[in-house]
């Protein structure tokens, strides 16, 4: 008879521990999601401020960047070149906002997606605004910091047709 209360006490203790572990995992996931939203907002602010060094600093050393209508960049030099062109555009403005953050169960990998808006000045001097979406894959580094390992974006605007060559 004494084993039944002891067994029940053990079950209650085990269930309590399980609930604490589940709550802790949910809290950790929420903390990671918040941290990544904050990092993504800081990154957007750096790009909007045309701070090339800070903008590029969000990438991991082995990152790949896949801009629209261009080859992917797999070296920091190539990534820097892409961003140099973006931030150097006169009158350009760029911002983005995360709309979804998915964290892997392992807690060391996450996917951030959202929308962006970029305004550039065309050849006639008029502003042209592009809106689109993006996906980033973030990786937790050995030092505990999060860095973007893959970055791709594309426009919601219809593609422009290539110019037809004139007949002679």
Language-model-detected regions and their locations in the chain:
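Bacterial N-terminal signal peptides
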Residues: 9-21
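Sequence/structural signature of outer-membrane beta-barrel proteins
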Residues: 119-123, 156-158
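Short beta-strand edge/turn micro-motifs at domain boundaries
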Residues: 131-157
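Positively charged n-region of N-terminal signal peptides that target proteins for export
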Residues: 1-5
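Short, low-complexity N-terminal intrinsically disordered segments enriched in polar/charged residues
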Residues: 20-61, 160-168
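A solvent-exposed, acidic/Ser-Thr-rich amphipathic alpha-helical stretch
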Residues: 30-37, 52-107, 115, 120, ...
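A short, structured loop/turn motif at beta-sheet edges
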Residues: 103-110, 126, 139-145
């Amino acid at each position: 008879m004494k084993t039944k209360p002891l067994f029940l006490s053990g079950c209650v203790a085990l269930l309590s521990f399980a609930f604490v572990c589940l709550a802790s995992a949910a809290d950790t996931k929420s903390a990671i999601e918040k941290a990544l939203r904050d990092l993504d907002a800081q990154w957007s602010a750096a790009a909007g401020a045309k701070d090339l060094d800070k903008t590029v600093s969000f990438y991991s050393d082995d990152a790949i960047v896949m801009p629209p209508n261009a080859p992917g960049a797999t070296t920091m030099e190539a990534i820097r070149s892409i961003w140099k062109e973006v931030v150097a555009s006169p009158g350009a403005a760029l911002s983005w906002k995360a709309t979804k953050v998915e964290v892997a169960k392992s807690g060391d990998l996450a996917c951030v997606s959202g929308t962006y808006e970029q305004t550039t000045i065309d050849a006639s001097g008029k502003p042209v605004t592009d809106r689109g979406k993006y996906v980033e894959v973030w990786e937790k580094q050995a030092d505990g910091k999060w860095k973007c390992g893959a970055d791709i974006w594309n426009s919601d605007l219809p593609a422009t047709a290539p110019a037809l060559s004139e007949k002679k």
